């Protein structure tokens, strides 16, 4: 919907279908050039110089990982690792280091988010500036994306020889999966 501008969640959810599904790998990569810069600014705490909005929503980085996973399926895991491996590791480090302002990794392995004051998921309707459906806690789709990201990135880094990080991520996924 054009009236929403370029919202980060919508970008990453739709990117594989709009590009990879119609054999437009170059278009995917072109969009990711800008998206990667915006992600890096966000995780570095820098003000955004790109018109990709709502990057701070708790599920956005996980949707970015999912989009890159689709890229790996359509091209190759090796190509994904070469182009985006560092970005994927940096996203994972950002989340695991508890640097996100509204994404809290708890001891049970699940990610917790607070949506009391601001709509933070795809159910983002508001009335008088307040969420119609406030979503706070262990949001199911966020944690599904989290588990997926842990497993996908663990596999990629293991294939690249980083067995230590892969084992850490797999151990985290085991804890998350049991919760």
Predicted regions and their residues:
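Active-site flanking loop/helix segments enriched in acidic
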Residues: 1-2, 130
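Aromatic-rich carbohydrate-recognition surfaces in CAZymes
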Residues: 5, 9-11, 15-120, 139-143, ...
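Amphipathic alpha-helical interaction segments
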Residues: 71, 130, 154-155
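Active-site oxyanion-binding pockets that recognize sulfate/phosphate
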Residues: 78, 136, 163
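Catalytic cores of carbohydrate-active enzymes
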Residues: 96, 100-107, 147-179
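A short, charged helix-loop
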Residues: 117-134
């Amino acid at each position: 919907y054009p009236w929403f501008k370029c919202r980060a969640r919508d970008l990453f959810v739709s990117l594989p279908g709009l590009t990879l599904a119609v054999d437009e790998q170059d278009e995917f990569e072109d969009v990711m050039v800008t998206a990667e810069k915006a992600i890096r600014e966000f995780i570095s705490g820098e003000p955004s110089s790109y018109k990709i909005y709502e990057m701070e929503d708790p599920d956005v980085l996980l949707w970015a990982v999912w989009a890159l996973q689709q890229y790996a399926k359509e091209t190759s895991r090796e190509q994904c690792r070469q182009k985006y491996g560092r970005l994927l590791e940096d996203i994972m480090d950002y989340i695991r280091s508890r640097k996100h302002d509204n994404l809290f990794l708890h001891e049970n392995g699940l990610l917790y988010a607070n949506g009391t004051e601001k709509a933070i998921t795809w159910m983002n309707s508001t009335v008088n500036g307040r969420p119609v459906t406030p979503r706070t806690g262990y949001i199911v789709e966020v944690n599904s994306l989290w588990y997926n990201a842990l497993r996908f990135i663990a596999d990629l880094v293991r294939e690249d020889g980083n067995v230590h990080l892969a084992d850490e991520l797999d151990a985290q996924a085991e804890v998350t999966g049991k919760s």
